[in-house]
Amino acid sequence: MTVNDPSVIAELSELAERYETALMANDLPTLDGMFWQSPHVVRLGIGENLYGIESIAAFRAARPGGSPPRRVLRMTISSFGHDLGVINVEFQRIGAAVIGRQSQSWVRFAEGWRIVAAHVSLMGGGH
């Protein structure tokens, strides 16, 4: 197995940038489309545990104004083979001292890369 193949890392880097742009713009069609369209996809958030794409899409649609603005402090990307990648982001919400973390597991399907599992948390229990 090839770990951290440069071409796969480049693809995942582009996806990470696209995701961050969509998140900050509250571009729901793009965000929803980046997740695996399955009842088996999982997103564990700061105040919610979401199972299945319908739950994830409903959460995003009901969130007024989308995700709070943030800046990325650090990002790491790893790939395992050509069809599995992990993106971890350390972020800080604008105007807040608390540090947040985001982890995404990406799998390449026939239709392209999709997030199959995601986790978002804040350090220190703050919101």
For each feature predicted by the language model, list its residue ranges.
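Short, low-complexity N-terminal intrinsically disordered segments enriched in polar/charged residues
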Residues: 1-37, 49, 125-127
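Structural motif
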Residues: 37, 80-81, 109
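Conserved GNAT-family N-acetyltransferase fold
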Residues: 39, 89, 104
